[in-house]
C-alpha cells in the first residue's frame, strides 16, 4: 500500500528543505553583513582604523587598518612590476578563499607584490600582522554604504571596466600597472604573470 502525502505537506517539506539548504550555504562562507560592519568593531578596534592618503608603500605594516581609495591602489600597481590583489573577506570558508598570511607568503615566494584589501570590518581586526599594510575599501568616496555595491564599484573602477558584470573572483593580477585578469586562485593569478613553476605553500 502506497501512502500519498497531502500536497500541503509536500510543499511544507520542500520549503523546510530549501531553508536548510540555504542556511548551509550561508554558513559555509561567513561573508559579513549588508554594510561594512564598522559598528561591530569594539571602541579599541575602531581606533586602529585610519584614513590613508597617498603612497601605499609609505604605510606601516603594523596593526593599523588603512582605508584606501581606488587611485591609491592604481598608483601602487603602476609603481611595481607585478602585483596580485586579494579581495579579502575575513572569516570566509569558501574553497576560493585562502589564509591571508599564506597569500602574502606565496606572492613573495614568487617575486610578486601582494596587496590585501578587506571588504568587511567583521573579523578584519583579528588578522595577524602580515608584513605588509592591511587595507580596507573606503566606502565613502564610492557614495554607498552597501557592501556588495561598494565592492563592485571599487573593483570595476580599479580595472577600468565598463562591463555591467562585476568581477566574480577574488584575485586580481597587474603587470606594470596593466590589468591582466581576475582569477579564482592565487596560483592562477601568479601564472597569469608568466611566472614559471609557481611556488605553492
Per-region residue spans from a language model:
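C-terminal motif of bacterial Sec signal peptides marking the signal peptidase cleavage site
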Residues: 25-28
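Short, internal strand/loop/helix patches
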Residues: 129-168
Amino acid at each position: 500500500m502506497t501512502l500519498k502525502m497531502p500536497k500541503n505537506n509536500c510543499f511544507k517539506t520542500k520549503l523546510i528543505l530549501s531553508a536548510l539548504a540555504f542556511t548551509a550555504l550561508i554558513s559555509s562562507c561567513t561573508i559579513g553583513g549588508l554594510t561594512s560592519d564598522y559598528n561591530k568593531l569594539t571602541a579599541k578596534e575602531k581606533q586602529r582604523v585610519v584614513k590613508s592618503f597617498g603612497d601605499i608603500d609609505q604605510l606601516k605594516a603594523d596593526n593599523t587598518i588603512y582605508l584606501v581609495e581606488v587611485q591609491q591602489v592604481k598608483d601602487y600597481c603602476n609603481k611595481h612590476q607585478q602585483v596580485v590583489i586579494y579581495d579579502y573577506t575575513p572569516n570566509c570558508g569558501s574553497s576560493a578563499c585562502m589564509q591571508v598570511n599564506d597569500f602574502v607568503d606565496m606572492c613573495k615566494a614568487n617575486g610578486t607584490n601582494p596587496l590585501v584589501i578587506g571588504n568587511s570590518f567583521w573579523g578584519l581586526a583579528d588578522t595577524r600582522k602580515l608584513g605588509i599594510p592591511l587595507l580596507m575599501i573606503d566606502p565613502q568616496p564610492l557614495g554607498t554604504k552597501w557592501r556588495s555595491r561598494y565592492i563592485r564599484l571599487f573593483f570595476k573602477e580599479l580595472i577600468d571596466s565598463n562591463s555591467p558584470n562585476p568581477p566574480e573572483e577574488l584575485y586580481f593580477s597587474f603587470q606594470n600597472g596593466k590589468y591582466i585578469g581576475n582569477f579564482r586562485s592565487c596560483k592562477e593569478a601568479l601564472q597569469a604573470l608568466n611566472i614559471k613553476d609557481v611556488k605553492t605553500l
